[in-house]
Amino acid sequence: RRASKIRTTLTAQDPKLVERVLHPHAIAAIDRIVQAGVRTVILDECHHLLDHWALVIGLLLARIRASGREPIVIGLTATLPSVDDGRAFDTYSGLFGDVDFEVPTPAVVREGNLAPYRDLVWFTEPADDEITFLTSHDRQLRRFLKAVFAGGEGLDFLLESIGFIGIDGEQPTGIDAQLEADYAFTESAAQILIHTHGDHPAALTLPRLIGNRRPSIDSAIRVCARFALEKILPDASRADEWHAMRRTLKDFGYYLTDRGIRAGRNPVNTVMAQSHAKNDAAVDIVHHELASADGQHVRAVIVCDFATEGNRRGRSTGPVASAVECFARVCADATTAGLHPILLTSQHLHVASADAQWIIPALEELSGLRLAVDSGDENEPEQADHLVTRVKVESSSPSAAVLVRAVSALMEQGTVRLLVGTRGLLGEGWDCPAVNTLIDLTAVATSAATQQLRGRTLRLDPQWPGKVAHNWGVICVMPPRISLDSDAEISRMNRRHEQLWGLDVTLPTGHAPQASDYLQVSDRPHPGNQPQPANTLLSGQFPQIVTGVDHSLTLTGQARLRALLEGDRRATINQLNEQTLQLIASRAATYEQWGIGQPYSGDTSHDTAVSAGKNPTFYSPPTLWTAVALLSGLCALLAGIIWPMLVMWGTHPVRILIALAFMVVLLGIAGAWRLPVEIWRMLRGRSHPARVYAGATVAVSRGLVASERGQRLVSLDEFQVRPYGAVTVGTQAMPAGYVVSLPDVPDASARTIIDAVSEVFAPIETPRFLLRVTFQGDSQRPSTLLLRMVSWIAQRISPSALYVQVPREVGRRKAGAKEFARAWAELIGPCQLVEVSGAEAMRPLAQARLASRNNQSHSRVRTVWA
């Protein structure tokens, strides 16, 4: 590893030094190629060109150029390296640049060259002993925070961190300046204050500003680190306290030095990623697969990260989570043991004891190797000898590749139907067409590793022409009863699915979007345009093919997962898994949904699925209903004035007309005509939310153009919004939201707009501008005296307001933010643009963030293949 780093550093400084670090044989090969006049270099599996061979190819290209010829380099790969590879990815990009042509996996499937598939997710909770460890970890963290901040010095530090001065009414004062200086740290310090000094006056008032959520582990640890750096480290007499703090933080996975703190290997995330419960989940998955309509076709492989090593936290006794331990669990179950499983790693070959007498001879015949029962290694985990038999190779030159081919042959024969192994051996390069079920227990999430693993099941199987692959990911989630936050597993799931295509499962079964499902809205008249489905896959014959979790989790499943992660004890993993099981009822149905051999356009586009959460972010319910009440009162008041006039003058038609004219003049002078207009616009937005999402899309596009980001955008004339419908979560009906797409806009421009639209409806972070959705905005629309008066009264009676964040690209220039607000007011309703600058803007930002979290709005960008 050090030699590789040195070579890379030297060659980055001077490419001519490459020849000095390469072997003479490599230099001789380059000389022969250049002398032969080669100009075109074709590199298959080019994703391997990350280190040594990248240097060789780089030198070859330089030598070809030096000979007077411009080289042509063609790289072929099915798995691009990940940007997470850092310098290696930079080396690769330096050779090939951006991708010039890509054939998405769905196209290869539709052409009939790969098997159709479905990506599935199975959820589990940590094992009992791991839950004991996690509960203890949670308790220790709380005790640690209390010990650090319970004393007078800790309390003073927290109050100093939030800038607390006193209480003004029901709000703490002094916090605004600290929020402006460092919002994230100040919010974390305030959260710790609330949960460690709940009876302090500041702690009693802060929840109204920032909420009552517990601080995350990361944020709490960083507050502790700053306390140690500022209060303990400078005092030489507190050296022992400093070292004790360092040791404690190390136990939580953080390394504290005099230069700051850095995150290490988080023990909570390690336990979740390598939980023993995943082995039980793998067995459960096999059970359900065998019980499905296509159970007789199942040939499964369980892939683990390590053969014998793994997480030991939370395991007082017994083996660690590994491939060996997983195989022992498989053999202990009667159903999975009946599939005649084999464990195969680079160093291990295990079989079920009940199968040893016939599997070992079969492997010897297929591999040509001499095999024998192994008595075991004292360094290996202990196993139940009556269930598992270790096999050793007695041949002088054993080859893992030979054994892999032999085991693959048994899988193809159907003699062996379950294989357990490691990613290192069964990842890239392993070819067994009979395998149709992958159970991924690994912790990898990079693009290359994820696609390589799932590619193992996509080979066409001559013995099953209707083959459909099931690729399972197993995700361990924290039980709601444990307050520790651990989103690493969910983040890993999301990163994996961002790289994978699959059949969209978020639409109701049998739903076929029609022309009436679309809205055509334009920021200027555009005659002659008729709304049409964006692509052939929206015709209702086949589901959409998308990236992201939408091809693995139904809308109900996604809502239940969010509830589970938010600590709702009514949500359970069984509810999540029940949703998944509905997707594996018939592989034949999945085969039909892929439309093998059917025509397709081959285009890709982007859309965003948005949900307004509990309260739509495009109107302010308390203020709206207060304004309605005031309008009703105003009408009653005018009626009370006019009625005595009619009684006094009589009911002659002329006198009635005079009274009505008098009322109209009064209302006109006051500008009351605008009041029902504004209320009507808000009510219409509530009744037809699709128009609001559409208006937001136009507002974003106009804001991008005004911010000069639009130089790379086309003129936006129209867009379409496809409704999702509604789902039920528990006993509460929640809107599933809408999918916003731009089918007639070039993909690059559409992606820019879609990303910005998604940001509008995402939880608020720290934007430069906010949009306050009010009953009456500022100068974005003309106002009247009565309208301003009613708005003022309504907001005093019911001051609640909702906020949306102005997208970063739109808010880069103030002109873009102003145009966004102007378009919002024109197309959706009144609003007020708030610049998040200065201490006075921090309180609205805190209120906006709190309302956004409570509202539970969310959005996600997807890529759609047509």
Tell me the role of every PLM-derived stretch.
Residues 1-3, 8-12, 32, 37, ...:
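Conserved C-terminal RecA-like helicase domain
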Residues 2-72:
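SF2 helicase catalytic motif II
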Residues 452, 456-490:
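Conserved segment of the helicase C-terminal RecA-like domain
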Residues 47-51, 81-82, 309, 425-428, ...:
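Residues immediately C-terminal
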Residues 48-114:
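Post-DEXD/H (motif II) to motif III coupling segment of the RecA-like Helicase ATP-binding lobe
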Residues 150-185, 189-191, 488-808:
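Long, largely alpha-helical accessory region at the distal end of helicase-like NTP-driven motors
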Residues 420, 430-443, 469-473:
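A short beta-strand element within the Helicase C-terminal
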Residues 66-67, 446, 456-468, 501-506:
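Arginine/glycine-rich "motif VI" loop of SF2 helicases in the C-terminal RecA-like domain
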